[in-house]
Amino acid sequence: KSGFITKSSSVKEGMDIKDPKNKIIIIYNHGQNKNDLAFKNECIWVNQIINQASLVDEEINGKKIMVYNFCSNDFAGDMSLKKHWWNSKTPYVGKHKLDKRVEKNLELVEKFVTIGVPRKQIIISGHSCGGLLTLMLLSAHPEKVSGGISYMQACFGKLSSYYKVKKVGPEAALAKFAKKKPGPAELRERQ
């Protein structure tokens, strides 16, 4: 569920913020287990919530940190896995789930700004596909938030082991991936 992470690692639904001008909001984006499908219950990973909870109520220059767990797994991309897009030889048609998640994050940022949180005090963060989402949002809309924290932004499969990145180098591995899976490779390049 979406809501603010508490110090005790639970999630309190809602967007209640007392004194929004003196808060720093970190929007946390989870990863995705099923890259393009809708799975409502897959958005709270206990180990990640515990890490995020350690930031709650910390202060920077008199401003308290609040961490918002943003559950955005309840919708699918236009070509979900059911349509076999991962094995497609053609480019992805429509919006991928990650593109839609970027849009949802931008909407959430605007809600926080409307409540009174200054843009310069809103930070996007994410793990795994949420980390890639963070990079996508910041590269396309750097003016919308103060910055981002992206960690372990592995998304779209384990290219490192499957394509022997360590042995052949990243360029050769990505070329092999593009040859075997041109549809996903095009999407990866576009994003």
Go through each PLM region and give its residues.
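Cap/lid segment of the alpha/beta-hydrolase catalytic domain
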Residues: L37, I65, N69-D99
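Short, surface-exposed "cap/lid" segments of acyl-processing enzymes
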Residues: D16-I60
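Alpha/beta-hydrolase fold active-site loops
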Residues: K23-I24, I65, Q121
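Alpha/beta-hydrolase active-site loop
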Residues: K89-I115
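Gly/Ala-rich beta-loop-alpha elbow adjacent to hydrolase catalytic centers
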Residues: S125-G130, T134
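Hydrolase active-site cap/lid region
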Residues: M136-R188
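A short loop-to-beta-strand scaffold at the N-terminal edge of the catalytic core in hydrolase folds
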Residues: K1-I17
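Short, solvent-exposed loop/turn and secondary-structure capping segments
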Residues: L37-N41, M79-K82, M136, S160-Y163
